[in-house]
């Protein structure tokens, strides 16, 4: 491979990192308080939830890329691989939020309510009267579910794009998958640091921090891309 053949994979890796970082800001993460239904969102950490969706997206993308007749040099096939990643991630996170919601509503007996908005931007439902005193919301309201689904789609797209770039660099499918997982984690952790705790979704004031996180991932992914190209060249 000559130097010019590395430009496209480097650009794809850099863009993928920025997309992954942006996706994490959409995911409704309530952390440990949400596990006790005292905070809005899913009861786990930012990185874990985003990475879970991203891994599923990577598996879906890898499955599509391995199909007979699929070529990474074909733009239509690349789009199909990326869409497969997006759909896989959306299914994973959608089911996670759905099962969590069932437990919150029927197991704990709370009404899903967002603390960071007066009305749900999607349904227009008033939120504050339904928030239990002493909590910062609970459950997964409609706006959080929609935001999480968008985040999962972006995460799946970013992860799939990184996988495509790694295969274009000549890495075997298994190695490309391992490297893509590590790459996804790197950007998810950067986003987690940028958020600084919990986030409800695109309606949360912390969502405004996203540009800083995207810039950080853009730079770090560019450096990571250069390292990966060096690995592909055998340096």
From Swiss-Prot:
Membrane topology field: Multi-pass membrane protein
GO MF annotations, alphabetized: tetrahydromethanopterin S-methyltransferase activity
EC supergroup of this enzyme: translocase
Pathways per UniProt: One-carbon metabolism; methanogenesis from CO(2); methyl-coenzyme M from 5,10-methylene-5,6,7,8-tetrahydromethanopterin: step 2/2
Residue spans crossing the bilayer: 15-37, 49-71, 86-108, 143-165, 169-191, 212-234
E.C. number(s) listed in UniProt: 7.2.1.4
Keyword Methyltransferase appears in the UniProt entry: yes
Catalysis performed (reactions): 5-methyl-5,6,7,8-tetrahydromethanopterin + coenzyme M + 2 Na(+)(in) = 5,6,7,8-tetrahydromethanopterin + methyl-coenzyme M + 2 Na(+)(out)
Alphabetical UniProt keywords: Cell membrane, Membrane, Methanogenesis, Methyltransferase, One-carbon metabolism, Transferase, Translocase, Transmembrane, Transmembrane helix
GO biological process: methanogenesis, from carbon dioxide; methylation; one-carbon metabolic process
Tagged with keyword Transferase: yes
Top-rank lineage group of the source organism: Archaea
Subcellular location: Cell membrane
Pfam families listed in its UniProt record: MtrD
UniProt GO cellular component terms: cytoplasm; plasma membrane; vesicle membrane
Chief location of this protein within or outside the cell: membrane
Subunit details: The complex is composed of 8 subunits; MtrA, MtrB, MtrC, MtrD, MtrE, MtrF, MtrG and MtrH.
Family of this protein: Belongs to the MtrD family.
Function: Part of a complex that catalyzes the formation of methyl-coenzyme M and tetrahydromethanopterin from coenzyme M and methyl-tetrahydromethanopterin. This is an energy-conserving, sodium-ion translocating step.
Record-given protein name: Tetrahydromethanopterin S-methyltransferase subunit D
Source species: Methanococcus maripaludis (strain DSM 14266 / JCM 13030 / NBRC 101832 / S2 / LL)
Lineage of producing organism: Archaea, Methanobacteriati, Methanobacteriota, Methanomada group, Methanococci
């Amino acid at each position: 491979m000559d130097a010019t053949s590395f430009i496209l994979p480097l650009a794809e890796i850099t863009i993928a990192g920025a997309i992954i970082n942006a996706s994490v800001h959409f995911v409704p993460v309530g952390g440990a308080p949400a596990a006790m239904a005292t905070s809005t969102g899913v009861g786990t950490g930012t990185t874990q939830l985003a990475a879970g969706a991203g891994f599923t997206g990577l598996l879906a993308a890898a499955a599509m890329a391995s199909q007979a007749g699929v070529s990474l040099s074909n733009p239509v096939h690349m789009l199909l691989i990326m869409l497969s990643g997006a759909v896989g991630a959306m299914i994973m996170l959608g089911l996670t939020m759905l099962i969590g919601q069932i437990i919150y509503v029927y197991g704990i007996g709370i009404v899903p309510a967002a603390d960071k908005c007066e009305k749900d931007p999607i349904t227009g439902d008033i939120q504050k009267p339904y928030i239990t005193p002493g909590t910062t919301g609970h459950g997964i309201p409609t706006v959080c579910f929609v935001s999480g689904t968008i985040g999962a789609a972006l995460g799946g797209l970013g992860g799939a794009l990184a996988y495509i770039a790694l295969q274009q660099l000549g890495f075997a499918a298994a190695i490309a998958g391992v490297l893509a997982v590590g790459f996804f984690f790197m950007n998810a952790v950067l986003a987690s640091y940028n958020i600084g705790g919990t986030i409800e979704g695109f309606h949360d004031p912390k969502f405004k921090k996203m540009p800083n996180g995207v810039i950080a991932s853009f730079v770090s992914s560019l450096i990571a891309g250069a390292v990966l190209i060096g690995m592909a060249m055998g340096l």
